[in-house]
Amino acid sequence: MIVVRYADDLVAGFQHRADAERLLRDFQERLAKFGLEVHPEKTRLIEFGRFAASDRRKRGQGKPETFTFLGFTHFCGTNSRGQFVVWRHTAAKRMRAKLRVIQQELRRMMHEPVALVGAWLKRVVEGYYQYHAVPGNLSVLSRFRERLCRYWRHVLRRRSQRRKPDWDRLRPIFERWIPRPRTLHPYPDVRFDARIRGRSRMR
């Protein structure tokens, strides 16, 4: 059994479905004693893991389901060597919400100096990358950056009373103020190995 918990959210992994069903049942009964219940939409049992894809393929079923946890959609995949990997992409709903907030702020700052807006955007984007720049998520973050460039371009073109700036004129501005994404975190196994190296994993 593997459990990852943060605040009141948790993910539990089991080798056998019966064990997962037993824990869910016990958990529901425990909460009911206090007049509580699990979230009906967020609580579910799914087949996930190293053998999920092959087992489902044998049964004529589709790809393993995904789940969202701590702002990431987790899904089964493989790396360049064909080894099983749990990939994480920024949850689409979460990214749309962030982009909407930034877009609104860009409109509000329409007539502020470019350097002021750019410095603000850079801080926002770097902070976003600090959390979301995990292995396998760069394509999503690249789309995030591309969307921001479009939003800012729209604002800059609207405030110009003369010639509307084109992409060639705006690209250097975007390159200066909106950093391109790069992976900032190792895969979880690397961090875990660094913490337990030289010690028993059973401690």
Question: Which residues does each PLM region occupy?
Answer:
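Non-catalytic terminal/accessory segments
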Residues: M1-R203
